[in-house]
Amino acid sequence: MSIVYILAAILIFGVLIAVHELGHFLAAKACGVRVNEFAIGMGPAIWKKQKGDTLYAWRAFPVGGFCAMEGEEDDSNDPASLNNQGFWCKLLIFAAGALMNFLAGFLIVFFLYIGAKGFYTADIAKLNPDFPQQGESGVMVGDRIYAINGERVYLHSDVGLILQAIPLDENGTIEMILLRDGEKLERTLTLQDYTDENGKSYRAYGFTYGGMEEANFLTRLKYTCLNTVDFVRTVRLSIQMLLNGQAGMKDLSGPVGIVTTITNVGEQSENTRDAIDNIAYLAALIAVNLGVMNLLPLPALDGGKIFFLVVNGISRKVFGKQIPPKFENYVHYAGLVLLLGLMVVITFQDVWKIFT
């Protein structure tokens, strides 16, 4: 592995986690919550400065950071403590880290698209001569693939992603929605047997797809938005594949696995410019991934805190009481232990893959 790409991967992790914590910090300040310390990096402090109520620190290891708020882990009578804030302030503070990750992913993609000349589309480009559903009542060249089995096609690459992620029967039956002159058309397609020019048989749907939309400011903005939404959907499909058994533990990657992926992407790029662009695009995906994963309603994650916040809000209105803070803390601590245990297992698995 190239040391340059390894360092780049570590830097990406550090920056994205720091951006996440910056979101919590800015939201806390906006809501009047006292932040006792805001640190970039982990480990011993190599620089620190007290400004007002907050200690700002730069720590030795560039692998994230933290935002320590008053009343975050225990009850505090201080009006500026987190536990004394209202529902909406708490919701904003808990969600702000993930929102900053989404914003980071969006901005990275937008800057990558500034130099784009055009964007590939999922338009039907060619039909096999033996394709059984040609014509107005079937599929025509120029039709745009809008959705497959209920999954919206935002980008050219989505067609392959969706076909890989969704369960299919033995005939590969798909329900496809096409756009033709602004009208949505429903079509059912199955895999067919075809013969190539060398006489070799193969199974396929019988069409190729790909067009080009010219780039301008509005299309760049549109495809940046679509790409960001698509990143979120990619994470959802990955979770869905884990739950339905299409993927397993062996397909999960932790920091070591992602460092390996970033290194491979860099080394397989044709030149330095392509390496920078490809790694930046992967960083955007990781940023959005961090945002989505942190919003999952699991203990110790921001989503778990939001879950308890909502449950407590409902409980106060219906029963006049809330879940004891100590119990919630125990749940988050237990969740943290389980998540750290899972991370250890995945890390060992990632290291094993490197040497096998």
Language model: regions and residue ranges:
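Residue-level signature of transmembrane alpha-helical entry/exit and packing/kink sites
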Residues: 1, 5, 9, 85-94, ...
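Small-residue-rich helix-interface/hinge motifs
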Residues: 4-78, 293-314
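Alpha-helical transmembrane segments of multi-pass membrane proteins
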Residues: 13-17, 68, 101, 105, ...
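Internal alpha-helical transmembrane segments
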Residues: 30, 54-57, 61-129, 332-335
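Functional transmembrane alpha-helices
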Residues: 81, 85, 126-130, 193-290, ...
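Residue-level "contact hotspot" at macromolecular interaction interfaces
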Residues: 132, 138-139, 152, 165-167, ...
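Conserved PDZ fold ligand-binding element
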Residues: 135-157, 228
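PDZ-domain C-terminal substructure recognizer with occasional recognition of PDZ-binding tails
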Residues: 162-201
